[in-house]
Amino acid sequence: MEIVRLSLFGNPNIGVYVFANNSIALVPPSLSSGEKKVIAETLDVELVETKIANTILNGVLVVGNDNGIILPRIILDEELDILNNNLKKHDLNIYVSRSKNTALGNILLCNNKACIAGSELERQELNKISEALGVEALYKDIMNLTIPGSLAVVTDKGGVIHPDISDDENRELKEIFKVAFERATVNSGIPFIKSGLIANNKGIIVGEYTTGPEILRIRRGLSGGAI
């Protein structure tokens, strides 16, 4: 599995800017051609260029898997049109959440087997998200924090997570997502690993300040294999 370092907009916190599954990546329209090439080739995905809610924080505001994507209620009509037009061929469900929580990439953590949500998400939204993504969705705070999506990254091969997670919680996540999670940091010690990491089943992109030992742990976690 290929793993590369990257900064976007001069910032190693690349995970806040990009949402990716195994077929597409939603990227801000202002990326350079070189940056877009790295993302497309490393993850082996088609790029869809769009802002979300007139921001470049696609990784914070969007969540999903290979069955669907979940968008915040503050998305603009013209942005939704771009997504509808570009995602038809990928047969993705598109659901615009009505949740008061708009940072969906932080409050939700999903792969193609399960989805967990922080306890602040409304019950009716959890049910609709489960339907759109085609997986069981359940409430699960991590480390007493309601932002599981910012604490971890998970694919269908493995996961990486905040280094302070307890053994018991780590085992619970393994049971839910059917993959093992490796404790790791990114960008020279940042424990909120989503901020500096973009990954799918085919490739891994880490923030430019990620160290060699961090890369080894991230690679081990995301190459772990389904159980």
Curated annotation (Swiss-Prot):
Alphabetized UniProt keyword annotations: Initiation factor, Protein biosynthesis
Entry-linked InterPro entries: eIF6
Stored Gene3D superfamilies: L-arginine/glycine Amidinotransferase, Chain A
Pfam families noted in UniProt: eIF-6
Record GO terms (molecular function): ribosome binding; translation initiation factor activity
Entry's Gene Ontology BP terms: cytosolic ribosome assembly
Top-level division of the source organism's lineage: Archaea
Sequence intervals crossing the membrane: none
Function of the molecule: Binds to the 50S ribosomal subunit and prevents its association with the 30S ribosomal subunit to form the 70S initiation complex.
Family: Belongs to the eIF-6 family.
Protein name: Translation initiation factor 6
Organism (species): Staphylothermus marinus (strain ATCC 43588 / DSM 3639 / JCM 9404 / F1)
Gene label: eif6
